[in-house]
Amino acid sequence: MEILRGSPALSAFRITKLLSRCQDAHLLVSDIYAEYVHFADVSAPLSADEHARLQRLLQYGPSLPEHPPAGRLLLVTPRPGTISPWSSKATDIAHNCGLSQILRLERGLAFSIQGPDLNESQWKQLAALLHDRMMEAVFTDLQQAEQLFSHHQPAPVQRVDILGQGRSALEQANIKLGLALAQDEIDYLLTAFTGLGRNPTDIELYMFAQANSEHCRHKIFNADWVIDGVVQPKTLFKMIKNTFEHTPDYVLSAYKDNAAVMEGSQVGRFYATAEKGIYDYHQEEAHILMKVETHNHPTAISPWPGAATGSGGEIRDEGATGRGAKPKAGLVGFSVSNLRIPGFEQPWEENFGKPDRIVTALDIMTEGPLGGAAFNNEFGRPALLGYFRTYEERVNSHNGIELRGYHKPIMLAGGLGNIRADHVQKGEITVGAKLVVLGGPSMNIGLGGGAASSMASGQSDADLDFASVQRDNPEMERRCQEVIDRCWQLGEYNPILFIHDVGAGGLSNAMPELVNDGGRGGRFELRDILNDEPGMSPLEVWCNESQERYVLAVAPAQMALFDEICRRERAPYAVIGEATEEKHLLLNDRHFGNQPIDMPLDVLLGKTPKMLRDVTRLQAKGDALQRADISLAEAVKRIMHLPAVAEKTFLITIGDRTVTGMVTRDQMVGPWQIPVADCAVTSASLDSYYGEAMSLGERAPVALLDFAASARLAVGEALTNIAATQIGELKRIKLSANWMSAAGHPGEDAGLYDAVRAVGEELCPALEITIPVGKDSMSMKTRWQEGHEQREMTSPLSLVITAFARIEDVRRTVTPQLRTDKGDNALLLIDLGAGHNALGATALTQVYRQLGDKPADVRNVQQLAGFFNAMQRLVADQHLLAYHDRSDGGLLVTLAEMAFAGHCGVTVDIQSLGNDALAALFNEELGAVIQVRAEQRADVEKLLADHGLANCVHYLGRAVAGDTFDIRSGTDVVYSEKRSTLRLWWAETSWQMQRLRDNPDCADQEHQAKQDESDPGLNVKLTFDPAEDIAAPFILKQARPKVAVLREQGVNSHVEMAAAFHRAGFDAVDVHMSDLLAGRTDLQSFQTLVACGGFSYGDVLGAGEGWAKSILFNDRVRDEFEAFFHRPTTLALGVCNGCQMMSNLRELIPGAEHWPRFVRNLSDSFEARFSLVEVASSPSLFMQDMVGSRMPIAVSHGEGQVEVRDAAHLAALEQSHLVALRFVNNHGVVTEQYPANPNGSANGITAVTSVSGRATVMMPHPERVFRTVSNSWHPEEWGEDSPWMRMFRNARKQLG
């Protein structure tokens, strides 16, 4: 084992936070220093040259002190027996740099602890603060890291002696293996294997448990029901399917695949042809697929990987739909118990304790969103939608006083994608078809996830909780998706016959499902499975839940094509078996010469005993709201701090929202980028205005008073959130229903039945809306011992509805931004509660630790439909200036958020809403506030009346310029406050979370910036005409120069980059680094090179540095790049990851010696912003005629801060006039202040060019916003092309 020092690992503020935590724990630690240390497992000793190469490869990040400070060593590494995602990616880079004798690289974190001697107990306490026990181990000596590379002989299969010991043997195995088998399932297995005349193996039992777990089989949703002694006519699933039977319109696939599919639009899908690799538009149907999953149990145990693999698993579901599909846009949501932010505890928050083995709600919301965002970011899918609810309270329920909340959290992951018409249905698996595992190797992780997630938290053994934690590698999943993309792009020649993702239960669930769904059996070889841990037993190899894997059936004649695609994308795969005629599973193990699995498929997936739920209805009545202690002014401040209401910027700016170039509506609204969007919208392609929209609805606390009302409200809220997009008819909307319940808890089962019936049998059929997809999680309860007391925390019945729809014109989407620049205006409330104004289970009751009695509900189904149809007319006719639905916090919050987005005031009169101001302002009945022009008010009110809404419409008042927020009732002042004050209250929860998680100085700067009342918002100043197409004369000559659109594994922004160059008149050619390294392509034939954005190698050795070193350490490829850069007629552009990569190639680029490096953002966080930049005077040929222009641009990076050697280096860079772009604030001043400057770069620098101007590198993404519709905000006068299109046309002009 070789040991090499790495870079300093923690920023100063992270060290300060660690020291603070030590102080809180009464540990006398005076200082902490941390640096990375690398361990290399080698097959043979490295030569001096190889060692020097490895050392250079592992030099990234800040420079090291010559010697680490003195102190006691605590070394934190991945848990022995596991392989970290960092290791997988770093080892790949080493191999691509010619270091083939490196078997594996791994990285640890070496802490040097200074201070008085601590006793052994205190050291253990300190070690616990420094590592995640679920994923990491602590050593006190560097040599102990040898354990990371320990190799074991394979363990043999075990047999369970039922023939000798009968039922007791199965019962013991059930406990030992954590199978979570029910008693009737044990009987079933005993009968089955006795009938086969043999003892089952442990792997067969484990496989059965996973395949038949509640998580995988959804037994409760398929159960028979008796309620209050009455047999119910339908299962839960049949009631959901009733929506499809009633309204099958536009649904192409439901209930039978990894995601549902509905009709989309005929558009030009942009991708490279297989023959020449040239990008072009392909006119075809882009149907819409939709899926929403939950990943609750893993997120409770270890939030980052739990949320990351939750998003990753859902993305795989989309990609594995039909015969292969394309994930496009994602969503993430969380329900947790109260945060109790240190120093910011709220009056409604009480600490009820928790089990040791799960983390706190604060930990979940600190780490979980980062994990979900990181996976989406690195994969290259924009996360555009979400929700965040907290609930934890002592409630007087139908069971008396009990604790209700989300100690077991909800972690929601979902999204939409596109699929070709001819790939919607899976193909036929022919006998002899090759059975393939695509993706990473098996590792001993995630064992038992299906069974573990089916238990209430606290029931399973702690070791099984450790075993069920998973690890994420989104860059690997991206490679696999690139393979799937190449396959579906082949159309009728697609080599994929059948595909499923590998999720819960690993291959033990995926492979039987694949062959069974294809009407076949399978014969497999265990030792052909890619395996990074050869010491695993057959059970561990077959059943582990290593992520980023798919199982496929491929025709033998197409294996050569499939192999070629995988090799180019560097996506590992293994052929592990063949499809058989007989529906039988046979798993051979050539190492031991036996068959760990030899069983008929119908034993595994046959008719296991059907569940019967015999339950009783119980529903709390609640208590009338006690108003004596409620002051309206105090209520407003409390509600503005409640996470469900409060600003969620800390959850949004960590997620890339612009990748693909097809995002037309993200969360951030208007020139002031306020996170209040009602829904997410994407364009269907890069050449059309058709699109897709998705929205969320959930009102879980209402279930504590009325199960069915809570479910109806979730559907209603999803509809009111999506209503301001141009959809057309209501039946175009399709829903995903995700049900979370504590099955078995008194009253909850019958409540679940009533809620499903309310939606599936009544509301959705009445609205003609289909629920073609969904998921359930039936173990939403946590048990633990608190002192001598047994405690339980039970979640409310929680239905999360996601609405999906095809959009006619993405430009018609209306946002909550109030307008004061359109003349006199009117604000109208459309109250679908029809004056009921119920306050039960609202934000108001929650912040006063009450529940209330009567909740909101869908009062009139016809009016809800009429409301949607009326909004569609108003949207199509462009009569709406602004729109925002009423939800958590009620009307007051709706108006406030609209005012925040418009940076303006409102004056309203609520007299028409009744005499109860509290109820009028804080009820959460369905509805919306719309802003219209004053002269159109009468017409709008008539249209609403024509749709049956006459009794729901109330004129409130108007939006006004300034900082007022005034609510009156007649002549009485009900509430008056500055809008800017409300804005800061609303922001405080996000600010406090950001301070805890990120650099607190940056968080403070952002909060301070929100107090600038003179902030003009994003604005534009152009020194050229963006409508002028300066490339048109050259395009007319029909000469299309070739641009090499260069990507490395993990790059994800190449398609939109190619589209921008294509529009400017280039032939954009797809060039993978593997093409250059293999000599299939060379740069000699290109005049232009663009290195694209993303996460090459997952950024593990510094952003873009691994990519650069794979060029620098390969002599032939290095010479090729150097020759290209030295040719006097070439152009080169590097964007984001490509910028970082090219900055590390500066020794090859003439005139680039002053270029900086790009390092970790000052905030120490990934930053996704829509930032204002100014084009500086520079030689850049890409920026010609743009100098002095100021305009917003997409920013998405974690390492974008300019790093120079010293002040002299910075001065030389400036004096050379090589700075091409700078961040400016909304006042147009160059800035280093966060977040206007999102990475902290000196002098606002964010793009530099070479002396000749032929090579330019920039961190922002012009290719994602070259279309006007792809800008989060833009001036209304812009046409199809945004001003950023000029960059690409400048390039075309330069080539003549």
Curated annotation (Swiss-Prot):
Molecular functions per Gene Ontology: ATP binding; metal ion binding; phosphoribosylformylglycinamidine synthase activity
Residues forming the catalytic site: C1136 (nucleophile), H1261, E1263
Protein name per UniProt: Phosphoribosylformylglycinamidine synthase
Gene Ontology cellular-component terms listed: cytoplasm
Gene name in the database record: purL
InterPro entries linked: Class_I_gatase-like, FGAR-AT_N, FGAR-AT_PurM_N-like, PurL_large, PurL_linker, PurM-like_C_dom, PurM-like_C_sf, PurM-like_N_sf
Keyword Transmembrane helix set for record: no
Biological role stated in the UniProt entry: Phosphoribosylformylglycinamidine synthase involved in the purines biosynthetic pathway. Catalyzes the ATP-dependent conversion of formylglycinamide ribonucleotide (FGAR) and glutamine to yield formylglycinamidine ribonucleotide (FGAM) and glutamate.
Places the protein is found: Cytoplasm
GO biological process: one example: purine nucleotide biosynthetic process
Reaction catalysed by this enzyme: N(2)-formyl-N(1)-(5-phospho-beta-D-ribosyl)glycinamide + L-glutamine + ATP + H2O = 2-formamido-N(1)-(5-O-phospho-beta-D-ribosyl)acetamidine + L-glutamate + ADP + phosphate + H(+)
Organism of this sequence: Yersinia pestis
